[in-house]
Amino acid sequence: MEILMASSNLIKQLQERGLVAQVTDEDALAERLAQGPIALYCGFDPTADSLHLGHLVPLLCLKRFQQAGHKPVALVGGATGLIGDPSFKAAERKLNTEETVQEWVAKIRKQVAPFLDFDCGENSAIAANNYDWFGSMNVLTFLRDIGKHFSVNQMINKEAVKQRLNRDDQGISFTEFSYNLLQGYDFACLNKLHGVALQIGGSDQWGNITSGIDLTRRLHQNQVFGLTVPLITKADGTKFGKTEGGAVWLDPKKTSPYKFYQFWINTADADVYRFLKFFTFMDIEEINALEEEDKNSGKAPRAQYVLAEQVTRLVHGEEGLVAAKRITECLFSGSLSALSEADFEQLAQDGVPMVEMEKGADLMQALVDAELQPSRGQARKTIASNAVTINGEKQSDPEYIFNDEDRLFGRYTLLRRGKKNYCLICWK
């Protein structure tokens, strides 16, 4: 009974967290949820070999529904990924080969799996791939059975497409224009196969979702619903989920757990409590209490550490979180003895600036090559002023030449200038 109670309030709970951008027929959906568990889906197109932070809110939304007793379907678009969604994109997407897309499908399925429970009885999650129904469909079937239900007049008036059509330098190909039909049919297909009654997605998907609702009604005479989550923005107007190095990925080989943890630690005070509502499963009351505590403590806020810990654990597990915190602590304290070889690999991947050097190099040259100083002369002064450490140990001899003891695990040396400027030397 508790599950159903939570479920009937689910839309309200999501709204309290700021997680609802648009919803079709909210009262009817709330009533449907109150009657008992439903199946719902969210689609993830393989446009790269990993999901990124932008995918996390809808993915966690699937998890929220499952926790309330509903059955989530994670659809990876093996077919739609071959076409490319034009929604609010300034230019035509590059088409990827079928082999590449199928490889990416496998990786993304694996990435989605830990967030959902695929073995919990009646509301066990399902993984689906729309290539299963589009792969063998011929063009005549597509045009007759799907195309005849779509009005071109309505399609070109959808905001996502209209923006492209209004650009003089960019039109839209028939390939991308037809994407709306494919995603619409996904909904109708999942409704028939698994009784899916709700699609969730980012607010840029509204046009595709409403097409699917309309098509499902026409093909199966079933009422289904759509709900979108907001696209995440930052208070300062800059794009969320990007760093100087590009997107923040969920794949630890593309964004290390340390870098991922640091991304959240650096969240602005103006964003952090909102992000706790979006990206964690903490109660609203708990988040509000934390905000109040931070406001009155007179110290640096604790919220960023709570956020970083919660989201890193969600995405990278306890092991990833422990490593990220260990690296953070060691860099802060300057004592590197607790770092493992795997920790150094994370730092080399994207944690701190990295430079490769030949054995026999001296400290002055290392500071220049690492861009910690502009010239050997400047490097000499900095070293002499006791402002440089090698693996956490001060070194004030400008003529210092690195030796084997400086090469941790035979390969790594961490330089620091001042308090915060790091560079990792990887010896060739």
Curated annotation (Swiss-Prot):
One CC-aspect GO term: cytosol
- What PROSITE patterns is this protein classified in? AA_TRNA_LIGASE_I, S4
Instruction: Give this protein's Gene Ontology molecular function annotations.
Output: ATP binding; RNA binding; tyrosine-tRNA ligase activity
> Can you tell me where the transmembrane regions are?
none
GO process terms (BP):
tyrosyl-tRNA aminoacylation
State the reactions this protein catalyses: tRNA(Tyr) + L-tyrosine + ATP = L-tyrosyl-tRNA(Tyr) + AMP + diphosphate + H(+)
Motif window: 'KMSKS' region: 239-243
- The UniProt annotation places L-tyrosine binding at 41, 179, 183
**In terms of domain of life, where is this protein from?**
Bacteria
Its keywords, alphabetically, are: Aminoacyl-tRNA synthetase, ATP-binding, Cytoplasm, Ligase, Nucleotide-binding, Protein biosynthesis, RNA-binding
Q: Which residues bind ATP?
A: 242
Q: Give the location of motif 'HIGH' region in residue numbers.
A: 46-55
Compartments it resides in: Cytoplasm
| Enzyme Commission designation | 6.1.1.1
Provide the S4 RNA-binding domain boundaries: 361-418
Q: Which Gene3D superfamilies match?
A: HUPs, RNA-binding S4 domain, Tyrosyl-Transfer RNA Synthetase
Per the record, the similarity remark reads: Belongs to the class-I aminoacyl-tRNA synthetase family. TyrS type 1 subfamily.
- What's this protein's function? Catalyzes the attachment of tyrosine to tRNA(Tyr) in a two-step reaction: tyrosine is first activated by ATP to form Tyr-AMP and then transferred to the acceptor end of tRNA(Tyr).
Record text on subunit structure and interactions: Homodimer.
Entry protein name: Tyrosine--tRNA ligase
Species whose genome carries this gene: Salmonella paratyphi C (strain RKS4594)
Give the source lineage, highest ranks first.
Bacteria, Pseudomonadati, Pseudomonadota, Gammaproteobacteria, Enterobacterales
